[in-house]
């Protein structure tokens, strides 16, 4: 299992590589949805808390959909 910070940064990077116009914003929105944590929680606990395999899978699935231009809403 990886830390939440590592997972968030990888998601943001995948969106950047896909040419997303706002990768940081989109990644944090999806992160907040999957992990039920806000940005402050990520900053405070992102390097110590780990994701479950299910959470990680769901997050990256949503990242890939967003990379293919699926709207956030």
Model-predicted segments: where are they?
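Non-catalytic nucleic-acid substrate-recognition regions in nucleic-acid-modifying enzymes
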Residues: 1-23
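A sequence-composition feature that detects small, non-aromatic residues
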Residues: 18, 24-27, 51, 67
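Short, surface-exposed acidic
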Residues: 20-26, 39-44
């Amino acid at each position: 299992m990886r830390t939440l910070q590592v997972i968030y940064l990888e998601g943001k990077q995948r969106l950047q590589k896909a040419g997303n116009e706002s990768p940081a914003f989109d990644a944090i929105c999806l992160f907040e949805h999957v992990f039920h944590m806000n940005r402050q929680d990520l900053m405070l606990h992102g390097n110590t808390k780990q994701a479950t395999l299910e959470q990680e899978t769901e997050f990256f699935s949503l990242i890939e959909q967003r990379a293919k231009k699926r709207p956030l809403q």
